[in-house]
Amino acid sequence: HLPQVSSSLHSRAATSVVDLNGNEIQLHDMLSGHYLTTANAPVLESTALFNNNNNFNHDVVNGLNRDPSPTFPTKQAVKKDRHSKIYTSQGPRDRRVRLSIGIARKFFDLQEMLGFDKPSKTLDWLLTKSKTAVKELVQSKSTKSNSSSPCDDCEEVVSVESENVTDHSKGKSLKANNKCKEAMDSHQAAAKESRAKARARARERTKEKMCIKQLNEAIVLRNHQFEVSGTREAFVHPVFGFHQQNYGNTSHENWDQSNFASQSNQLCAIL
């Protein structure tokens, strides 16, 4: 429940101007200190908070963020390599060298024996002591480059290796082909032999069939001849009696024997 305000305050409040511009509310005469009492302090605090909140929302809408803390954390800068590089024919090289355990132990033992305090001095001593070997290496490299380039040497090595590989593969392929040919020849020989045996067996079977057929035909023919001869003997006139019948029978039997002998001779010739 708000306390009553005097008539002068009402008259001043009537003349006060409330301007609504976007989200901002401007209070002119209501915020003057000599018209307010201590009882109106909570109301003024709430209006001040409302104004601050509206101002913050207006700034956010317009793209202004007054929060001092950054929204996204910035990435840390990458630490640059402060060591200078040495440029060689194969590109830049780092001055720092990583040694294996055995080589590092030998290197530092040599450094302690020489009494040097820096590894570069030890390396300088090693290079000066190996000047002759370095010169010989440079001379050998120069002679090789004049005679044939390293690429040519590599190509020769690769060609020799490829020839060896091809020869080896050719030898293997020839051996495999020879084995296959031998197997095929043996298989073909066995097949030819089996076919020859089959043909021989077929010829023997046909001969047997022909012999059996001819024998059957001869037997049928002989039986037919016996039947014909029996009918002829039934019509013989009994003039001379027994002697004439015997003559006819003997002649018929002689003819049958000669015929059968000729047929047997033909069968033997076929076999």
Swiss-Prot record:
Compartments, record wording: Nucleus
Q: Does the keyword DNA-binding apply?
A: yes
Q: Does the keyword Oxidoreductase apply?
A: no
| UniProt xrefs under InterPro entries | CYC/TB1_R_domain (IPR017888), TF_TCP_subgr (IPR017887), Transcription_factor_TCP (IPR005333)
User: Single GO cellular component annotation?
Assistant: nucleus
- Tell me, which GO biological process terms does this entry list? regulation of secondary shoot formation
Give the span(s) annotated as Disordered: 64-85
In the record, what terms sit under GO molecular function? Answer: DNA-binding transcription factor activity; sequence-specific DNA binding
What does this chain do? Involved in the dorsovental asymmetry of flowers. Retards growth rate and reduces organ number in the dorsal region of flowers.
The molecule here is called Transcription factor CYCLOIDEA
* Organism whose genome encodes this protein: Antirrhinum cirrhigerum (Snapdragon)
